[in-house]
Amino acid sequence: YYVPRCGEEYIAYDHIYLPTPEKDFSYNGRIYLVAGAVAQENPDQATDVMAVVSSANIFYVSENNIYSATEIWNDRETRTEIVRIGYRDGKFTDGAAGSVVGELHNNFSMNEADDCLRIVTTVEGWDKDYSNFSRSNGLYVLNEKLKTIGKIEDLAEGEQIKAARFMGDTGYFVTYRNTDPLFAADLSDPKNPRIMSELNITGFSEYLHFYGENQLLGIGWETDPDTGNVTGMKCSMFDISDPSDVRETDRFILKDVSFCDALYNYHAILAAPKKSLFGFAYGIYGDNTDVYDSSENYYYALLSYHDQNGFEPQMYLNINDSELFAGSMSYQDYCRVRGVYIGDMFYLVTEKGIVSYNIQKDYEQTGTLKWEA
């Protein structure tokens, strides 16, 4: 190990946190995670700094804590090491470390409430004689010292977690093999979490987004329940007003979609429940199935959702045929496309410029602004 720096200053030894390695587990390298705090009135100087020895690639930040998750493994199983560093009033506080069985899907697999960390993981590994490989899922509740105080294990055997989201005392997570169980878990008693409902539908959601107070939007893929083959991109709306009886109220299928960055980068999704709008960019393979060479098949879909009518398409835009790109749009350009609205105007923001559309006039294009080269 080396001593890390913040700017030109070496970090003091008592501000470097070294978690105790778990016996018989390996790590994919070790690097420093350095966090600094600055005051707004004097931003060129750090008020405090903390370093953690970690290989973490998943992070979650709550109101008063920073969590990092590192995958560790031995020859039979995978675990996730969690490190917590507290922060309050511009100062970092003592850390804590713990671990759970399995691996996290992404940062939405973690959530803090009432000084407890709730985690969902996919657990897989070999038995003692390496004759059988198994996969299941677990839900764990850790206290402020990151010790497990409650858990549910062996959920959805043979499946893996595809999406998760938490709200208050309820956790929602999707597992998948050939069908899509959406679980709702009661977390009101941290020591005794329980599954309240399990909804089985075809396909699976890759991303969950709370859509107003009592609805949950799922975006992912529709699949054939017999073969598991993808048949289209799916948007599902779930009624979560009663977590013990979650229902899918509507679904919308986009055919022939090959890839969608928004499923893995939530910043790429426009979600505006008050406007009843959501949108995302997606791609369709042409003759060449290399994603980096499909420069003529990028689109933006804008949809609405109302309780009475369900999902309704508002606009499909062929982005790379627009005057901004004129057929020369790259995959990197596509990944940076964003949709926003201001008042009654919808704007498509890209690397090459902005295009505006009037929502009240059936999304009539009203103007284009190209960035100067």
Language-model features and meaning:
Residues 1-373:
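Beta-sheet-rich non-transmembrane sensory/scaffold domains
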